Each structure stands twice: as structure tokens, then as C-alpha cells.
Amino acid sequence: MRTQWVAKRRGQNNVSQMYYARQGVMTEEMDYVAKRENLPPELIREEVARGRMIIPANINHTNLEPMCIGIASKCKVNANIGASPNSSNLDEEVAKLNLAVKYGADTVMDLSTGGGDLDAIRSAVIKASPVPIGTVPIYQALESVHGNIENLTPDDFLHIIEKHAQQGVDYMTIHAGILIEHLPLVRSRLTGIVSRGGGIIARWMLHHHQQNPLYTHFDEIIEIFKKYDVSFSLGDSLRPGCTHDASDEAQLAELKTLGQLTRRAWEHDVQVMVEGPGHVPMDQIEFNVKKQMEECSEAPFYVLGPLVTDIAPGYDHITSAIGAAMAGWYGTAMLCYVTPKEHLGLPDAEDVRNGLIAYKIAAHAADIARHRPGARDRDDELSKARYNFDWNRQFELSLDPDRAKEYHDETLPADIYKTAEFCSMCGPKFCPMQTKVDADALTELEKFLAQKDKEKVAQ
């Protein structure tokens, strides 16, 4: 779809959506996004220019259907997929991608660390994906030196980053905010550093006693991103891995650096969103969102969860969706899903489905709470269908139509029950939805009550 759109931009030094927005140019991507969001195109351009919104759209991802991430638009959901050395392969990852898109993922991150040819897996995922694809290039950088962190060089990082950009990756997690002086701050934590990428950088700095190479070479990464319109997803290497560690000195020190890096990227018209925690008690979620907006000049916030309790392995799609809904309500722009397998293993297709639906619920609830235009329209339509016992319409409007129909049909599978005025919960005689109060009856009741009021006054 975008082949002709981007053809005229190739060869320019900067092809980012932010660059064009700041030049006053309305790109085709901005116009497309405006239609999807039902927002004025000029608002989209202004928000991208200001940095409060990004349109992750690598010029080499031409089959992309452009979308946006920002506080002015609907709350978005990311799904993670990825092969590991112990599980999964190319075909399985493409299948997970298709499933994620089916169930409403707005973006997908390929977090592959093994399981085959990483370049081939990434290429296949990008080719098959209508949604933006994100990656964490440090994983492949480590794989390229066979896991020997001490052998990694800044050139290794830059080489892999450019390779991902050339392939069409739309945004990349870059762990540039963790500095060598931050490392002593994790001493008081229960769970230390829980970011995979952050852990790699931390071990590199501890071995070499040198500053984070992604920080010292940040301007070179900016130059790569300008050429392909790759968006930064600034990684939170020091995100809390348990509620005990939430909002601590280490997390907030890195956040300050992420704000500085955000503004450095903006100086070159490169798009940025900022990643956030993690594990956060409910009473600290608002603080975390507001603090990010303050430190990062309102760049879009992209959070993993957050999980609001640590005691539910196997159900962390629920513990985190609670926090995600709150974070979205307070202004987070995108939620990274968590599956039931979080902390336990690599998610399979059913885990992807369950995690995504939990997060679509959270994002939608946030949109309603923020009074975004049209956010409740689907709810109202489903409520009408429910009141009218239009079962097929209810299934159709559900976030997971297959699951809704499956549960209904477990006890009432015959087609005749698709028009029945009850389900198996209440049966045919006790369903409260059968209580239909028509307008004439209400008019008669109002007359009766008015007469009673007159009689009381007369007394």
C-alpha cells in the first residue's frame, strides 16, 4: 500500500514522519491515521510534530497499514512473539503474528533470541505483518558473538541496528538510558535488573568499566533511524521486577536520562516513545505515568503491564491487565501485553490469545474512562443486542467472538437457542432481560404517580 507513498522520500537524509510534520507536510500516513482514529488530519500532524504521537512506519515496510501511538489517540496494545533457543521456529512465529493481528494487536514485537535464522524469522514476520514491527536488536548482537558479552563492540551494536532498519523494522527498543553510575543503585532491590537488554548492557559495563555504548553512540543510532524512519522505543533497563522495587531511585534515575535522550532524538526530528514498568502497586501507577510525562516532555509512554501484585504466576495476564487499565486511564499511550506464561515459559498460541484479549479489554476500558470520541459506541451496540437477545450480534461485537460463542454453545448449542430469550444461567423463567417496560406502561405509571402526589398535597 505504501510503495508509492515512500518512493518519493527515498534518498533524502531524513524521511521521518516527525521531520515532515515539522515542515508542515501532511504525509499520506498522517492522513490515513486520521481516518482510522476519526481525528482531524491537522491534529495528527501537530501531535507528531510536537512529539506526543508517533507513526512507526519504516520506509521499507511497505505493506504496513499505518497507525499511531499517542495520548490524543486510542490506547494501543502490543503483542510480543519470538523464537527462543529452546522453543519455536519461523513458521510458528508467523502463525503467532497472524493470531495476534486477528485478536487486535496494534503492533507486534519480534523478540526472537534463537530457534533458527534470526534474520529469516524477522524478514518473514515483517513481510507478513500489516501492523508495525518492533525488535530489540541487542538480542541479535549478543547472538552474533555467541553469547560472549565481553566481546561485544559498539560497531556490533550499530551493525545489527542498521540491519534491522534495512529489513523494515518500524521501532526498536534501545537500552541507552542505563548508565554505569546507575548500577550501584540496584543494590537495595529484591530482584535487581530484570530487563534482558538492560542486563546485557549492565554486564558489558561491569566487565569493561566503560559507559553504556548505546548511550555514547546514541547520535550514530539517530542517523540510522533518520534514514529509514525507525522510531525509538527507549528501553527501561531498570524497570522494577517486583512491587518492592517500584518507583525506586534506580528506576527514576534512568527515567531522567531517557528524557534527555528523547529530546536529543527530537533535535534530529526522530520519533520517540518511552518504555515503562513493570511491577507497580496500584497506588503508584498514576505517579509513574505523570512522572514519565514530566521527565520525557510528554513523549508517548509504553508500559509492560504493570503487574499490581507478584503472587499469581499463571495469571499474570490478569494481574497486569488491572495495572494496564489504570495506566491507560492516566494517559499511557500503548500497553505491552502479558500472557499467562509470564515468568514461567515461552507463550504458545493460546497464551497469545488470552494475553491479547486481556489487554484489549484494558485499553478499551481506558479509552472509555478518558472519554475518547466513540469509545463506548461498541459497548452500547452490544448492550442493545444483549437486551434484545440477539445472540449472533453479541458474538459479532465481542472482543473474542469465537470464545463468546463457544461458551454460549457449551450448554445451548442448537441453532434455535440463538433466538431464545434466555441463556443457561437463568433459564427461560428467570432472565431479568425479559422484563420489558414499554413507553405506554411508563406513561400510565407516571400519571398514576402524579395523581398520588396531588392527593398528598390536598391532604
UniProtKB/Swiss-Prot annotation:
Entry coiled-coil feature ranges: none
Catalyzed reaction equations: 5-amino-1-(5-phospho-beta-D-ribosyl)imidazole + S-adenosyl-L-methionine = 4-amino-2-methyl-5-(phosphooxymethyl)pyrimidine + CO + 5'-deoxyadenosine + formate + L-methionine + 3 H(+)
This protein's pathway: Cofactor biosynthesis; thiamine diphosphate biosynthesis
Chain residues that bind substrate: N80, M109, Y139, H175, S195, R196, G197, D236, S237, L238, R239, E275, Y302
Enzyme class, spelled out: lyase
Annotated signal peptide: none
Function comment: Catalyzes the synthesis of the hydroxymethylpyrimidine phosphate (HMP-P) moiety of thiamine from aminoimidazole ribotide (AIR) in a radical S-adenosyl-L-methionine (SAM)-dependent reaction.
UniProt name for this protein: Phosphomethylpyrimidine synthase
Taxonomic lineage of the native organism: Bacteria, Bacillati, Cyanobacteriota, Cyanophyceae, Oscillatoriophycideae
Gene from which this protein is expressed: thiC
